[in-house]
Amino acid sequence: MSRYHEEYARWRKDPEGFWAEAAQEISWYKLWDRVFDPYMGEYGRWFAGAECNTAYNCLDRHVESGRGQQLALIYDSPVTGTKKTFTYAELTDEVATFAGVLKDLGVGKGDRVVIYMPMVPEAVIAMLACARIGAIHSVVFGGFASNELATRINDAKPIAVVSASCGVEPGRVVAYKPLLDKAIELSEHKPEHCVILQRPLLEAPLVPDRDLDWQTLVQDAKSRGRKAGCVSVAATDPLYILYTSGTTGQPKGVVRDNGGHMVALKWSMKNHYGVDPGEVYWAASDVGWVVGHSYIVYGPLLHGCTTVLYEGKPVGTPDAGAFWRVISEHKVVAMFTAPTAFRAIKKEDPQGEFIKKYDLSHFRTLFLAGERADPETVKWAEEKLKVPVIDHWWQTETGWAICGNPVGLGLLPVKHGSPTVPMPGYDLYVLDEKCNPLPPGQTGTLAIKLPLPPSCLPTLWNNNERFRKSYLSEFPGYYTTSD
């Protein structure tokens, strides 16, 4: 029996009580004055007056509670033939050291850092190091074109950019440094520093007085014992800016706060994805997208899971068994990826022959999102993997599921082509053009009645007017999903 309906009703009856209870799973330096302040910001703000630190909750807290020797991060890179693991204690040390490096470069609370990196552990370390010192990271998908990167640098105005010499794709190396140099040339805003991770496959020339070598900085900090502690920030302070991937015009900088984000992600790991602390969770996405932010980095680490950072593809690295190898080797219990990945695997291995080569006995659930999950692909995955395949729907703007099938509360019947039910926090309606709710079977605009739940964007970076116009103006009192 699923407890979903009971939980959803409990949220409806007392939204503030529901989220205050969920917030007990997070460590706070100072508790909130109000769970929800309806007078703050564009539609109200969650956990107003509270103080916290996201990196502390992702790392130090687990070390202090005796989880230091558990694996926090598994880096698996078939494209470079490397694997590396970090315990919670090791990852905390690496993050504290790089946070010290950033501080020494003049990065402080509220400053922005653009991260333009491939799928390497240093990308995760840089994100968490920013969170540790209260800086705001803006991750740009590695290899994005120079003009796209330039618009983001111009909008975020970072003190520093953290990048790498290259990304690695099957059969080719993508030089990042020329793209970054061109972006800085195009941008009106010039970052003071660029920290460059030199990867063995391609060394990038460094620009004197601007570019610094990651390894040199980190080794120097370690030799001095330089580590930065966690800085207390307001729950309503930004953790990051993530630009929506619109390739035309000015991209929208989605703002994510610290407090509500942690509360919602921690709740989702147990209740939606059905995983427990200590288990291995794998989101086969990229840190440049929202799935990478929420479910490679923050969600699993907040929950005390082991997260997998995979630098490879569903097929061709080396074959259509790549995903099954990772699941088998690292004892993954739940995986989250895009339907496209499974369409590629199904095309290469329609009979699922590769699946038979691996022990997937510990694997429990597959989650799909990011685009439409066509019923054929879902059925194929169900049939071949013999586990529930859960389609769910959300947005960069929300940071976690709007609709899904909450495994941790007990599975609801799966209906192919449907993301099942709204999560607690989302009062979802289909509206006609006059803002009237439509009955089942009618087509209209999907809208969420305000206020949005914790983790959802409070506004756009430096652009409240555009936020109101894009999301709140079409149907007064509602957030328009545009889906």
Regions found by a protein language model. Give the residues of each.
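N-lobe entry segment of adenylate-forming
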Residues: M1-F86, E90-D93, T97-G100, I184, ...
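Conserved AMP-binding/adenylate-forming core of the ANL superfamily
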Residues: A55-Y56, L73-L128, A145, L149-A150, ...
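Gly/Ser/Thr-rich phosphate-binding loop
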Residues: C305, V333-T337, K346-P413, D427, ...
